[in-house]
């Protein structure tokens, strides 16, 4: 039987977006459409509900990774490991992590510090008289660095080499806030799948709705068939204005509110 995993990432302290995604997932779980839920990190930063987001994810018992922002705040650092393109962006980023470090509770900081950098799942596939296993690797940025950006235009061969080195058939990651899925044939005959989940709380693809991915593994197919893994990117409407207005009412830069509205 196929199994479906829901994987979310990059919530970034946006509680209304997370609540909308969890409501969507609860309905799917009730209908038996989802078997498990995972989170790839970056719970905090840029918006106003870092403690509430961390508490909700933790309270749900969702297996969660540390994103680069979580690591920075977990260590009470002034560096989130982010790549800001301009001096103005860097200055706003410094304001964000400074405010977040002042806002989080000791309990939230301990939780962020406890999160692992990767999660590996072995999914067994009954096939003919033998059994194959799909190796699923979940990271925030890449297998090499928590803050490495893997964009869709990266050469396919680079993805394949990275996944071969990590022993992964399917790699799930976030960090760029831009969803995509690549099916990657390789020289050993198997097809590898690289899946960026997109972002729950701070999309950058022009669509302000919250995003996550449903990953379905088909037990009737082998790893030489691209169809053994299917990724469906889901978008969920939420009250973007409420999140943006909360940013504007806080000491955080107003630019972050515009980014929520414009998904950039």
What name fits each language-model region?
Residues 20-23, 52-55, 78-81, 152-153, ...:
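Short, glycine/charged-enriched secondary-structure capping and boundary segments
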Residues 1-6, 121-137, 185-193, 226-229:
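Beta-strand-turn-beta hairpins that frame and shape the catalytic cleft
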Residues 53-54, 59-121, 133, 153-167:
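Active-site neighborhood of divalent metal-dependent phosphoester bond hydrolases
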Residues 32-33, 103-183, 264:
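His/acidic metal-ligating clusters that form di-metal
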Residues 8-9, 37-42, 63-68, 139, ...:
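Active-site neighborhood of phospho(di)ester-bond hydrolases with catalytic His/Asp-centered motifs
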Residues 12-16, 45-48, 69-75, 120, ...:
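Active-site environment of divalent metal-dependent phosphoester hydrolases
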Residues 1-60:
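N-terminal active-site segment of His-dependent metallophosphoesterases
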Residues 183-264:
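Acidic, His/Gly-rich catalytic cores of divalent-metal-dependent hydrolytic chemistry
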């Amino acid at each position: 039987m196929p199994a479906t995993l829901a994987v979310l990432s990059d919530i970034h302290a946006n509680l209304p977006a997370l609540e909308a995604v969890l409501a969507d997932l609860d309905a799917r779980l009730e209908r038996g459409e989802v078997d498990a839920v995972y989170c790839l990190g970056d719970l905090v930063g840029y918006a106003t509900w870092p403690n509430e987001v961390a508490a909700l994810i933790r309270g749900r018992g969702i297996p969660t990774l540390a994103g680069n922002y979580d690591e920075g705040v977990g260590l009470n650092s002034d560096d989130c490991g982010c790549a800001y393109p301009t001096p103005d962006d860097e200055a706003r980023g410094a304001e964000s992590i400074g405010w977040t470090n002042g806002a989080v509770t000791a309990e939230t900081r301990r939780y962020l510090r406890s999160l692992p950098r990767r999660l590996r799942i072995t999914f067994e596939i009954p096939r003919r008289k033998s059994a194959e296993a799909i190796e699923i690797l979940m990271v925030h940025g890449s297998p090499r660095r928590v803050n490495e950006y893997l964009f869709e235009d990266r050469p396919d061969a680079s993805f394949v080499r990275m996944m071969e080195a990590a022993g992964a058939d399917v790699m799930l990651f976030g960090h760029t806030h831009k969803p995509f899925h690549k099916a990657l044939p390789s020289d050993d005959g198997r097809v590898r799948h690289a899946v960026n989940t997109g972002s729950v709380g701070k999309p950058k693809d022009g669509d302000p709705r919250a995003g996550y991915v449903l990953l379905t593994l088909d037990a009737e197919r082998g790893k030489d068939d691209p169809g053994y893994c299917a990724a469906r990117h889901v978008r969920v409407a939420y009250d973007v204005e409420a999140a943006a207005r909360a940013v504007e009412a806080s000491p955080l830069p107003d630019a972050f509110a515009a980014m929520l509205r414009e998904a950039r």
